[in-house]
Amino acid sequence: MPSGPISVARQVCVARIGAPHGVRGAMRLWSFTADPLAVGDYGPLSTKDGTRSFEIATARAAKDHLVVTLKGVTTRDEAVRLNGLELYVPRDALPPTEDDEYYHADLIGLPAITTSGEPLGRVLAIHNFGAGDIIEIAPASGPTLLLPFTNAVVPTVDLAAGQVIIELPAEIEGDTPNHPEA
């Protein structure tokens, strides 16, 4: 199991290790890449803090995950200790995106501006709880905003200018709906 410091700047999470599979060090792996089997093509996979790195020795598809072996991991006990570990690669190791596609890492930290030009906050995270992407905005004060990451709510992502434009929905943060029964 190779280890050594790796730069943590601009790291992108590409996989998460799951439970062991068998007794010879194989494990389940959930890949977050477009082609799950390509997860090892981006170079060594490292921990978030960059102190440990791993190379995929073998990988095969299985239902909704992969079954992989990592170089240097040869026993079930070693695989158990890695369960739940998220694996990262440098952002520049990933292929370029298509128009209207973004890596979450490229959006985190960008200023969020309303369509009227008012500062709203910064992009804190992108979530997906199963019904579509959610953009989390951290305003300068007050609670964070969770908004649907749709073209209607996020009409513009301008990576060159380093900002996202947000069209706030009419009913948000306790606004009273424009209905007579309200």
UniProtKB/Swiss-Prot annotation:
<comment type="subunit">
    <text>Binds ribosomal protein uS19.</text>
</comment>
<keyword id="KW-0143">Chaperone</keyword>
<keyword id="KW-0690">Ribosome biogenesis</keyword>
<dbReference type="GO" id="GO:0006364">
    <property type="term" value="P:rRNA processing"/>
</dbReference>
<dbReference type="InterPro" id="IPR011961">
    <property type="entry name" value="RimM"/>
</dbReference>
<dbReference type="InterPro" id="IPR056792">
    <property type="entry name" value="PRC_RimM"/>
</dbReference>
<feature type="domain" description="PRC barrel">
    <location>
        <begin position="99"/>
        <end position="176"/>
    </location>
</feature>
<keyword id="KW-0698">rRNA processing</keyword>
<comment type="function">
    <text>An accessory protein needed during the final step in the assembly of 30S ribosomal subunit, possibly for assembly of the head region. Essential for efficient processing of 16S rRNA. May be needed both before and after RbfA during the maturation of 16S rRNA. It has affinity for free ribosomal 30S subunits but not for 70S ribosomes.</text>
</comment>
<dbReference type="GO" id="GO:0005840">
    <property type="term" value="C:ribosome"/>
</dbReference>
<dbReference type="InterPro" id="IPR009000">
    <property type="entry name" value="Transl_B-barrel_sf"/>
</dbReference>
<dbReference type="GO" id="GO:0042274">
    <property type="term" value="P:ribosomal small subunit biogenesis"/>
</dbReference>
<keyword id="KW-0963">Cytoplasm</keyword>
<comment type="similarity">
    <text>Belongs to the RimM family.</text>
</comment>
<dbReference type="InterPro" id="IPR011033">
    <property type="entry name" value="PRC_barrel-like_sf"/>
</dbReference>
<dbReference type="Pfam" id="PF24986">
    <property type="entry name" value="PRC_RimM"/>
</dbReference>
<protein>
    <recommendedName>
        <fullName>Ribosome maturation factor RimM</fullName>
    </recommendedName>
</protein>
<dbReference type="InterPro" id="IPR036976">
    <property type="entry name" value="RimM_N_sf"/>
</dbReference>
<dbReference type="GO" id="GO:0043022">
    <property type="term" value="F:ribosome binding"/>
</dbReference>
<dbReference type="InterPro" id="IPR002676">
    <property type="entry name" value="RimM_N"/>
</dbReference>
<dbReference type="GO" id="GO:0005737">
    <property type="term" value="C:cytoplasm"/>
</dbReference>
<dbReference type="Pfam" id="PF01782">
    <property type="entry name" value="RimM"/>
</dbReference>
